[in-house]
Amino acid sequence: MAAKQLIFGDAARQSILKGVTLLTDAVKATLGPRGRNVVIERKFGSPNVTKDGVTVAKEIDLKEPFENMGAQLVREVASKTSDVAGDGTTTATVLAYAIYKEGLKYVSAGANSMDLKRGIDKAVEAVVEELKKISKPVVDKKEIAQVGTISANNDVSIGELIAEAMDKVGKDGVITVEEAKGMATTLDIVEGMQFDRGYISPYFITDPERLECILEDAFVLIHDKKISTMKDLLPILEQIARMGRPLLIIAEDVEGEALATLVVNKLRGVLQVCAVKAPGFGERRKAMLEDIAILTGGTVISEDIGLKLENVKVEDLGKAKKIIIDKDNTTIVEGAGDPQKIQARIKQIKVQIDETTSDYDREKLQERLAKLAGGVARINVGAATEAEMKEKKARVEDALNATRAAVEEGIVPGGGVALLRCQKALEKIKFENHDQQLGAEIVKKALEEPIKQIIANAGVEATLIVEKVKENKNINYGYDAYAEKFVDMMEAGIIDPTKVTRTALQNAASVAGLMLTTEVLVAEIPEEEKKPPMPSPDMY
C-alpha cells in the first residue's frame, strides 16, 4: 500500500480553493450568449471546440493531488446538474465557487463551519420556494422554441426544430439526436409505434421500389412462441382470407412449413400477409408484445394465459389503420386500442421509470413510453466539418434537455435574473445564531454571480448593470447580454427552465457545504520515477 500525505484545517481548504478556482476559471468563460469557446486537445484527430460547461469540466485533471480533489468535487456539481436537468452546468459551477470562496473567508475568520452550512441550506430552501413562485408554466410552441434557442447559444433554428419535434411527438415522446450525412440539419418524425424488426422474408414486399411491405386496415396476430407448423395457423388464416383483410404476424420466429405456406399464399394473391420477429428479449419482449397488443386492441396469444394458436378468433387480433414494414423496422400507425387502456399502460410505465435505479432500464422504459404516447422524432445534425458537427450536436442535446426541463417545471426569467430576484426571499428568514445568518449572506452574494459572469463575458462592466437591474421593481427586467440592452426577459424570450436553475443552486450549495466543513485531505504520495541504471561501458 502506497504511503499517504495529509494536510489539515485551513491549509486543506485553501488547497481545495486553488483547484476549484482553476476549474471554475476554465468553465465560466463559456457562460451566457457571449461566452467564449474552449478548445480541448484530443489524443487523435482534431481538437474538440466546445461551449458546454460540463464537457470542459470533465476534461480537467490537475497535477497537484490536493488541488485536484477540489476540482473533482466541483466537477461532480457540473455532471450531477447535467444528469438531472441536462443544462445549467456552468451556472452550477459558478455558484459552487462563489459559495465556497465567500464561506471560506468566514471559516478562516473563526466562524463555525457547521452553522454556516446550516445557514446555507436554509437559505437555499427559501430560494427554491421563491423560484417556484416566480416560475410560470410553458404553454405554447413559441416558448418551447425560446428555451431551446437560449440553451443552444442563441441558435434560433435549433430552438424551432426542437419545438416542432415536441409538438409532433408530445412531451413524453422520444426525440433522438443523430449525426447527418450532409450539411443541413433536419427533422424526421416517425408517427405511431416503431420497433426494430423487419420482414422475415423479402417475398412479403408489396412495394418493390421502396422495398417495403405496406398493409392497410390490417389485423395483427401477436404470439410469444415460434410458429413452425401450418396446422396451428390454418383456422385463423381461413377466416381472414374470407374477410379479404391483410394480416401482420408478430412471433418469436416464423420458420419452416409455416413460413413457406405464408409466402406461397402471398405470391398467389390468396392472402396479403407479412411476418416479423418479436422485438426485444426475455422479460422485455413480453412487455413490448403487451404494449403492441394494448395499442392495437388485441391479445398476446400466450400459453401462459391459456390461449393456444389453433383456438384464436378474429376478436383476439389487434387492428391498425396502416402498417409499414421494411427490412429493419416495423411501424404501426393508428392502432385500434382503447385510449383508456393505453393511458393506464402509460401511467404504469411512468411509475416503473420513477422506481428503477438502472439507467439502462430507465432508457428502455422511456422508449416504450414514447412508442405508446405517440411516436419518435429524430433530429439529424448537419455541419461542414466533423469538429463543427460534434460541437453543434452537443448544443442540440443541451437544448433538448433544457426544453424537457422547462415543460416539466416551468420557466423563469433568464440571464441570471431569476436568482437575483430571489435575494429578497432571504430577508424574511429567522436564524438561530449569527453564523447561520452569515450562511444566508453567503448565498445572497452568490446569487449575483451568474448574472455578473454573463455580463462580464460580454465584455461589459457588470457592477453598475446589476445594481440597475436590482433597482427595477419589474421581476422580469434584466440585461440582454447578446444585444447589450435592458429588456423584459420574458418578452424578449430570454428564459431558463426552473428545474435547471433550481438544480444548479441545490447541487452547488450541497458540494460547497461539504468543502467548507472539510478538515483533512488525504492523498497518495506520488512515486518518483526510477531512472534506468547507467549502461555498462562494455556494452559499446
From Swiss-Prot:
One Gene Ontology biological process: chaperone cofactor-dependent protein refolding
Binding site for ATP: T30, L31, G32, P33, K51, D87, G88, T89, T90, T91, G415, D496
First-listed, main subcellular location of the protein, grouped into a coarse class: cytoplasm
Catalytic activity: ATP + H2O + a folded polypeptide = ADP + phosphate + an unfolded polypeptide
InterPro entries named in the record: Chaperonin_Cpn60_CS, Cpn60/GroEL, Cpn60/GroEL/TCP-1, GroEL-like_apical_dom_sf, GROEL-like_equatorial_sf, TCP-1-like_intermed_sf
Highest taxon, organism lineage: Bacteria
Cross-referenced SUPFAM superfamilies: GroEL apical domain-like, GroEL equatorial domain-like, GroEL-intermediate domain like
A single GO molecular function term of this UniProt record: unfolded protein binding
Top EC category: isomerase
Family: Belongs to the chaperonin (HSP60) family.
PANTHER family: 60 KDA HEAT SHOCK PROTEIN, MITOCHONDRIAL (PTHR45633)
Protein's name in the database: Chaperonin GroEL
Species assigned in the record: Thermodesulfovibrio yellowstonii (strain ATCC 51303 / DSM 11347 / YP87)
Taxonomic classification: Bacteria, Pseudomonadati, Nitrospirota, Thermodesulfovibrionia, Thermodesulfovibrionales
Originating gene: groEL
